[in-house]
């Protein structure tokens, strides 16, 4: 029996948007961030879903813009003593688990993730205990405590390959927390997967009929879909994949127009990869319904320039990620399994 958190009835309060900044104010904060990064031996690690100006700043200062797997690798390999993680809290936790000797700062510790929020440790632990014969695989979008309960951690970029491997070993799987990604992986591999019923507030909003209408306006466009989207949306795709995989698909597909069903923060790097192509955001509303996320994670949007300055200036307290030693050691086991497995795929 599936453990079911009724996501559709769970309305997470969205955080306030960062204050509007003038062009001169943005320039002031960018220059200040550059100075602070140098002074503190810090490097920026930013996710594809952060705002374009944050991604550009990470690139300009020698940092990294990537998906959660590459963010983890970069932070693990970079010599800087401080990591400034521009993303959501589980990404900061992962960085700290992999780099306990480093100081890990975030613009705000209030940058949540609906997948993380929708998979509480207590309920998930009980779910796993109820199915002791299953191998527990959790998505990177989970808390350190949930990772500590898992056998494996996985990102969307290697999800199909990992589950295919475990299935070949005769393993039955508990998958958490994203039900859409879990169902997609089950369909791709045929594995015996029991899904936790979470969802991403951004990808869960993509609508089939609205996407069909946009495709009708651009019949020569390819449709790119992240597998956290509903299956009916995935069924319309010309390419399905993680953020990094979608960027590669944007480059390799012959189409000059691309309709993209993932967080629109990805457009910054995708347009860099194929500047000659037109990108269109897949609709997140339809049939008279308005969108809540409107194809951009509200928590990713909290990573503004002012917040980054505050994080670097204030350091601890509201900005530093701390993970208890025992919890870190438990969560490190499935994370290292993921990194070792991913390394074998290269």
From Swiss-Prot:
Q: What is its EC number?
A: 2.5.1.72
Q: Name one GO molecular function term.
A: 4 iron, 4 sulfur cluster binding
Q: Which residues bind [4Fe-4S] cluster?
A: 113, 200, 297
Q: Catalysed reaction(s)?
A: iminosuccinate + dihydroxyacetone phosphate = quinolinate + phosphate + 2 H2O + H(+)
Q: What InterPro entries has UniProt attached to this entry?
A: NadA (IPR003473), NadA_sf (IPR036094), Quinolinate_synth_A_type1 (IPR023513)
Name the residues that bind iminosuccinate.
Answer: 47, 68, 139-141, 156, 226-228, 243
Q: What is this protein called?
A: Quinolinate synthase
């Amino acid at each position: 029996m599936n453990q079911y958190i009724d996501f559709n009835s769970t309305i997470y309060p969205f955080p306030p948007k960062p204050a509007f900044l003038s062009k001169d104010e943005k320039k002031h904060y960018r220059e200040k961030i550059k100075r602070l990064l140098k002074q503190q031996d810090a490097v920026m690690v930013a996710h594809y879903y952060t705002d374009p100006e944050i991604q550009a700043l990470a690139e300009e200062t020698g940092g990294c813009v990537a998906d959660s797997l590459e963010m983890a690798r970069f932070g693990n390999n970079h010599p800087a003593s401080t990591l400034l993680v521009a993303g959501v809290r589980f990404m900061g936790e992962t960085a700290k688990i992999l780099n306990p000797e480093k100081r890990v700062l975030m613009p705000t510790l209030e940058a949540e993730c609906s997948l993380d929020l929708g998979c509480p440790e207590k309920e998930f632990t009980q779910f796993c205990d109820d199915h002791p014969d299953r191998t527990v695989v959790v998505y990177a979008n989970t808390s350190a405590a949930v990772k500590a309960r898992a056998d494996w951690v996985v990102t969307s970029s290697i999800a199909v390959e990992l589950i295919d491997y475990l299935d070949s070993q005769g393993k039955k799987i508990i998958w958490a927390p994203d039900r859409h990604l879990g169902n997609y992986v089950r369909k791709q591999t045929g594995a015996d997967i029991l899904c936790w019923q979470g969802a991403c507030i951004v990808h869960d909003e993509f609508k089939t009929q609205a996407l069909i209408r946009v495709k009708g306006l651009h019949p020569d466009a390819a449709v790119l879909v992240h597998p956290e989207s509903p299956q009916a949306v995935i069924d319309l795709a010309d390419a399905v994949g993680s953020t990094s995989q979608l960027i590669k698909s944007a480059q390799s597909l012959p189409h000059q127009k691309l309709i993209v069903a993932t967080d629109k923060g990805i457009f910054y790097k995708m347009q860099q990869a194929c500047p000659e192509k037109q990108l269109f955001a897949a609709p997140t509303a339809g049939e008279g319904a308005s969108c809540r996320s409107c194809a951009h994670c509200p928590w990713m949007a909290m990573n503004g320039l002012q917040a980054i300055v505050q994080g670097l200036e204030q350091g601890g307290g509201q900005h530093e990620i701390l993970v208890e030693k025992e919890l870190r050691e438990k969560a490190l086991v499935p994370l290292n399994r993921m990194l070792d497995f991913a390394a074998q795929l290269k």
